[in-house]
Amino acid sequence: MNDILNKEPMEEDYGIEKSLRPQFFNQYIGQDKVKEQLEIFIKAAKMREEVLDHVLLFGPPGLGKTTMAFVIANELGVNIKQTAGPAIEKPGDLVAILNELEPGDVLFIDEIHRMPMQVEEVLYSAMEDFYIDIMLGSGDGSRSVHLDLPPFTLVGATTRAGMLSNPLRARFGISSHMEYYQERDLEEIVKRTADIFEVEVIDNAALEIALRSRGTPRIANRLLKRVRDFAQIMGDGRVDKAITDKALSILDVDAAGLDYIDQKILRTMIEMYHGGPVGIGTLAVNIAEDRETVEDMYEPYLIQKGFLMRTKQGRKVTQRAYEHLGYVYNEED
């Protein structure tokens, strides 16, 4: 995939995303349904002087799950401790993290689906009853130690909700699905980021960047950064529609936000298989990508944009994809 359209965080994103991160719900653009629900749950918990139920945030990468976790902590007025599933390798690692929590704190675990099962099992009692029992030592000298924990809120984030075990999923009182962003929300995000970057962006340029951002704020901000570079070197520093079109064309991002591989998938299906249906494994072999990459990185956006659909027989290209790529659509195909 064209790196600029990769939804996973790149090294250059980390510092920028932190500086752009909204602090409270009234600064957070988009995800209105999720925000509305969480605002109610948080206000109710604060009125009862209770900790907020554990929250699961799930959805594609780049949609603001980490940002939402920090907003939740800020709205609660508590501290947040951040870690990631792969970093918690053994139960002792989890115990050390839990032991640092203060009453009411938020523990944010990104990629929670990647925690080892032995760690996950220790987390069950911590989430449900705020205690853990751990074994110290080994063999005849081993002993069980009971450790009470302060009440806390676990916020888990995952791009693979289906990989969570049923016992873990059941312990989240709140589950929030983060969806792809609408263009109008992405346009507002581009404008907000431009203000922070102190770069002038003309309205139609902000919309153009939004339209090509694959419904993902991370990509919108990354595109704005690159277009800003073109505007600085090839223009007068302002990001207008003309410089935006030129920059994104050079970056191989078309009007629908498709890159070379997206187009290759659709063209291969049209030219070799008359638009499908095609099995995902066969398709992956034909474009020299592994199946998981096609399923995780390309297919969701193509389906969301109406260029691809799943059937029992396999994947099929839609009439919209034919027209977008300049092919003549034959309904018999």
Swiss-Prot record:
CC terms in the record's Gene Ontology section: cytoplasm; Holliday junction resolvase complex
Annotated region (Head domain (RuvB-H)), positions in chain: 255-333
InterPro entries: AAA+_ATPase, AAA_lid_4, DNA_helicase_Holl-junc_RuvB, P-loop_NTPase, RuvB-like_N, RuvB_C, WH-like_DNA-bd_sf, WH_DNA-bd_sf
Keyword DNA repair: yes
Positions with a binding annotation for ATP: 20-21, 62, 65-67, 128-130, 171, 181, 218
UniProt binding sites for DNA: 291, 310, 315
Gene coding for it: ruvB
Major site of localization recorded for this protein: cytoplasm
Annotated residues for binding of Mg(2+): 66
Catalytic reaction(s) noted: ATP + H2O = ADP + phosphate + H(+)
Family to which this protein belongs: Belongs to the RuvB family.
Cellular localization per UniProt: Cytoplasm
GO MF assignments: ATP binding; ATP hydrolysis activity; four-way junction DNA binding; four-way junction helicase activity
Swiss-Prot/TrEMBL domain comment: Has 3 domains, the large (RuvB-L) and small ATPase (RuvB-S) domains and the C-terminal head (RuvB-H) domain. The head domain binds DNA, while the ATPase domains jointly bind ATP, ADP or are empty depending on the state of the subunit in the translocation cycle. During a single DNA translocation step the structure of each domain remains the same, but their relative positions change.
GO BP: DNA recombination; DNA repair
Keyword terms: ATP-binding, Cytoplasm, DNA damage, DNA recombination, DNA repair, DNA-binding, Hydrolase, Nucleotide-binding
Subunit structure: Homohexamer. Forms an RuvA(8)-RuvB(12)-Holliday junction (HJ) complex. HJ DNA is sandwiched between 2 RuvA tetramers; dsDNA enters through RuvA and exits via RuvB. An RuvB hexamer assembles on each DNA strand where it exits the tetramer. Each RuvB hexamer is contacted by two RuvA subunits (via domain III) on 2 adjacent RuvB subunits; this complex drives branch migration. In the full resolvosome a probable DNA-RuvA(4)-RuvB(12)-RuvC(2) complex forms which resolves the HJ.
Region (Small ATPAse domain (RuvB-S)): 182-252
PANTHER family per the UniProt record, alphabetical: HOLLIDAY JUNCTION BRANCH MIGRATION COMPLEX SUBUNIT RUVB, PTHR42848
Protein name: Holliday junction branch migration complex subunit RuvB
Region of interest (Large ATPase domain (RuvB-L)), ranges: 1-181
Function statement: The RuvA-RuvB-RuvC complex processes Holliday junction (HJ) DNA during genetic recombination and DNA repair, while the RuvA-RuvB complex plays an important role in the rescue of blocked DNA replication forks via replication fork reversal (RFR). RuvA specifically binds to HJ cruciform DNA, conferring on it an open structure. The RuvB hexamer acts as an ATP-dependent pump, pulling dsDNA into and through the RuvAB complex. RuvB forms 2 homohexamers on either side of HJ DNA bound by 1 or 2 RuvA tetramers; 4 subunits per hexamer contact DNA at a time.
